[in-house]
């Protein structure tokens, strides 16, 4: 599920450990979402669903037999994750539990942190409060701005999100056997 440019989505689709055929659907919630072009480029079915219509999302996910939901730059809080038909994971630009919610990068800079990073975690009822699956650290350089640090964190996300997805897929396979 995406809200923005779709770079994390495309990174998942093109990653060597990813079987593109396993990416069955991309749901987006902004009509001018850049991820739409990326989904079309890779032949991934995509569908607009308002973030206010979680019932429609659930209906689509069930119809497409989705086994894992990945929030790749989906900038809306899932109100009732327990109602979804499968696990949901999210990538967040901080080393959780620090700096939950919006403005995590700005908070890390303002608090003069030396290191920040990103976390992939399960989504639960608490905002950015689910079990952490994987984290990656990014040093904060003295010259870093919100923009430069955000880009550095995104590069780290590109490395850890596919690894976290593979980890979760293996867990799901073990549970099924």
Identify the function of each model-found stretch:
Residues 1-177:
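One-carbon transfer enzymes
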